[in-house]
């Protein structure tokens, strides 16, 4: 079931620098706040949050969920809690509504907070969390718009080839020295993700689009697989 569709709307000046790549794609609606943590027991932490929705209600989130790092973790228990909002205004207002460093003792005992950050989707993105490959990418501002355009083209090609895949590109705000552009490739299962990789390695026609997009990337900072899920939806 489609939970949320972030459709094309306004333009963020910081990521739509005019250049030889032509018209810049418009970002998607909505915004996210992410709290990066180290959980002592991710499953236990997630269950407690499912049972205690007060923090999500205080934030005013439309939808909230978690992503647990499954491969390439920087530390044991690497995960983050995300909250979806209708706008950057609402996302940034959430920082006044809830301080994760003052969480109830039951929650605080289950995780160590690393940092928090806000993200804006730079293309339409359907929120259907499951098997997710996340790349953190360093991309020159002058190439971001073209990269987003290539990811939109790639998503269309993958779906035409029979893959149920959502691709997201996200601009961080307030991420300190930790964050860069996020690229997410979301499939309904890990097996489905693996099938895409098999076809890529076999020289699928759509790989030419991927190659052109990677030519716009200065550096791949990290590459992980995560398992993501929704744990709260506003009533």
Describe each model-derived feature in a short phrase.
Residues 1-9:
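Sec-dependent signal peptide recognition
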Residues 18-235:
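Short S/T/G/P-rich N-terminal loop/turn motif that feeds into the first structured element of a domain
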């Amino acid at each position: 079931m489609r939970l949320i569709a972030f459709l094309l709307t306004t333009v963020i000046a910081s990521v739509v620098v005019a250049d030889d790549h032509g018209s810049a794609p418009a970002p998607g609606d909505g915004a996210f706040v992410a709290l990066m943590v180290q959980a002592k027991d991710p499953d236990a932490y997630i269950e407690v949050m499912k049972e205690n929705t007060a923090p999500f209600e205080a934030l005013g989130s439309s939808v909230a969920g978690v992503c647990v790092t499954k491969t390439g973790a920087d530390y044991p228990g690497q995960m983050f809690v995300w909250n979806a909002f209708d706008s950057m205004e609402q996302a940034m207002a959430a920082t006044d509504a809830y301080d994760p460093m003052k969480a109830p003792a039951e929650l605080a005992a289950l995780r160590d907070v690393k940092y928090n950050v806000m993200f804006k989707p730079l293309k339409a993105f359907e929120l259907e969390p499951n098997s997710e490959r996340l790349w953190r990418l360093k991309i020159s501002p002058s190439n971001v718009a073209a990269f987003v355009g290539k990811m939109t083209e790639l998503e269309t090609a993958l779906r035409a080839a029979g893959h149920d895949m959502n691709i997201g590109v996200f601009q961080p705000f307030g991420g300190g020295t930790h964050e860069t552009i996020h690229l997410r490739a979301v499939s309904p299962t890990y097996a489905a993700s693996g099938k895409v990789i098999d076809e890529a390695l076999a020289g699928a026609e759509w790989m030419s689009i991927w190659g052109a997009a990677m030519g716009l990337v200065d550096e791949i900072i990290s590459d992980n697989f995560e398992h993501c899920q929704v744990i709260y939806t506003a009533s």
